Amino acid sequence: HTPHNPPTELFDKYIKLAPNEAVAKYWAMCEWFDKTVGDLMNYLKKNSLEENTLIVYTADNGWIQSNKQNRYAPRSKRAPHEGGIRTPIMFKLPKVIEPEMNTSTLVSNIDLVPTVLDFLNITGEKLSGISIMEKDKLNARETLFVECYHHDILNIEHPTETVLYKVALNKKWKLMLPNTKMVVREFTLPDEQYY
């Protein structure tokens, strides 16, 4: 997230490689994030907490750094395209979660709470999401719904006033319903570019 203000030594490393200062700062921020996650993991291991700590990582939106401006590129943040809505969701718990990279199962941040409750062996009330541990239920999910908002909710009583897009997607198709000033567009997912 902005502001991109990495340590000087990381910025100096990437300014020689990047097309411009904004991209160098973004790349340096990525490495800085990796380092701080590594520091956390080392702390947990050093203090014998690693095997009893559930690590969860996710993001609220995608971000593709623009090569031309100090901001996100089109078709990423606040956009219904893959670069804007396809974000990582990662869980780590040694001896419980097997490492896996899965880019085809329909999973969303609404699945975070059911998953954490599942790990804690807590039966929650009916929730919208599905625990990632319930693979059969996840695989049976046919459609995922997404909303892309303007940066701020301007009217808390009517948050849908700032919805830019509503999206329904399955493993093959994505339907993007923009606000009334734009047209409805449909894509075949494998053909859509990430940026």
Please place each PLM-identified region on the residue numbering.
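Acidic active-site catalytic centers that drive phospho-/nucleotidyl reactions
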Residues: 34, 52, 60, 111, ...
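C-terminal cap/loop subdomain of S1 sulfatases and analogous C-terminal strand-loop tails that border
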Residues: 63-69, 98, 105, 110-113, ...
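Short secondary-structure boundary/capping segments
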Residues: 8-13, 71-74, 160
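A short beta-strand-to-alpha-helix junction
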Residues: 21-36, 49, 74-87, 97-114, ...
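A hydrophobic, helix-centered structural microdomain
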Residues: 1-19
